[in-house]
């Protein structure tokens, strides 16, 4: 799902069914919002899904975001988590890196 935000950001939301409960975790923050980078916040949420909300300055890339997130979720089928992403034009490789870093923090 995609919506416009008054500041010109595009907001994308995705939900994936999870199979690996994250349990009671402290919020994890990785990355830095800046040119060509992004910030990922991963935190516990009610339910068994992995929900993702993206605020991005790079409009029109919903299908690419979905592909990157599906790939991440295949590697890390987390359940009961909410992922919030603030993006300033990061490449798919950087997005994957930051998501993997957040998942590694949860696993440790």
Swiss-Prot record:
Keywords: Cytoplasm, Phosphoprotein, Plasmid
PTM annotation (O-(phosphoribosyl dephospho-coenzyme A)serine): residues: 35
InterPro entries registered for this protein in UniProt: Mal_deCO2ase/Cit_lyase_ACP (IPR023439), Malonate_deCO2ase_dsu (IPR009662)
Main location: cytoplasm
Entry's localization field: Cytoplasm
Highest taxon, organism lineage: Bacteria
PTM notes: Covalently binds the prosthetic group of malonate decarboxylase.
HAMAP family: Malonate_deCO2ase_dsu
Family designation: Belongs to the MdcC family.
Function: Subunit of malonate decarboxylase, it is an acyl carrier protein to which acetyl and malonyl thioester residues are bound via a 2'-(5''-phosphoribosyl)-3'-dephospho-CoA prosthetic group and turn over during the catalytic mechanism.
Protein name (record): Malonate decarboxylase acyl carrier protein
Organism, scientific name: Burkholderia cepacia
Underlying gene: mdcC
